[in-house]
């Protein structure tokens, strides 16, 4: 999609949310709060919850595209959905294959302008995907070393822990 189409989609999503009734907004916001429950249900029986998974994936893809084209934007529900999908990524690997590549691309190109909490959520997600062996050390370590340039003490601590953990596993 081109950037003009993305802007139209973003405007449409914003317009739809702004024009929701209070009940619809509560339902949408409640959907984010129920992610841990859905994660547990998916872990138990993933085929029964495919419809809910797809619904949330559609929302997440829209938010992912917004972040891809406007990386300095912070979306709270994006962070929650990102961690949710990272936790269940081993259950739906083909549907969620775009996440690691997209996160690496966003962080490589825009790590200095991404808001602090978004960077932390993205690094947490990549770390979780790495622990699930959905990413190799060769895919994340160069990025993690590059991210050490950020003037973010919490992020640097997290990155050092991830790097040391990966290097320890490699050397065993």
What are the residue ranges of the model-derived segments?
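Eukaryote-specific intrinsically disordered, low-complexity regulatory regions enriched
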Residues: 155-156
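Alpha-helical solenoid scaffolds in large eukaryotic transport, assembly, and signaling factors
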Residues: 2-150, 163-171
